[in-house]
């Protein structure tokens, strides 16, 4: 199933079926500061935090018209993978990743993002 994302009334882009942005976030104070930073950068309502089952680590889900990301806690609880797909050209994907990374930098959240294009890392942030 291919997800269709509308970026403007006259332009339709397809969100990739595989991830094209791979990230890692260090969150010693939990995921709430990450949610706040993401919503500040991308707008309210596009990020949710939930527990998938009792006793499981919290998960962040980011959904916009052009992006779909989800976190995965790594052993130890402070480090989280934050991978997802962004629709659009290579430049659009890089711009989205830069925007998210800038929000993390501003919030003093340690992170890394790799933007992948054609199977190769095209950009590493910050």
Task: Name each model-derived stretch.
Residues 1-126:
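Structured alpha/beta or helical-core interaction and ligand-binding surfaces enriched in interleaved
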């Amino acid at each position: 199933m291919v997800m269709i994302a509308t970026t403007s009334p006259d332009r339709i882009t397809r969100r990739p079926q595989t991830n094209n942005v791979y990230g890692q976030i260090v969150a010693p104070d939990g995921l709430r500061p990450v949610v706040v930073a993401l919503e500040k950068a991308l707008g309210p309502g596009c990020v949710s935090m939930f527990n998938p089952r009792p006793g499981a680590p919290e998960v962040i889900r980011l959904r916009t018209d052009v992006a779909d990301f989800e976190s995965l806690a790594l052993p130890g609880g402070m480090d989280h993978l934050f991978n997802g797909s962004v629709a659009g050209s290579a430049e659009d994907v890089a711009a989205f990743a830069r925007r998210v990374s800038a929000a993390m930098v501003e919030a003093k959240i340690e992170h890394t993002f790799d933007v992948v294009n054609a199977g190769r890392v095209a950009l590493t942030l910050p």
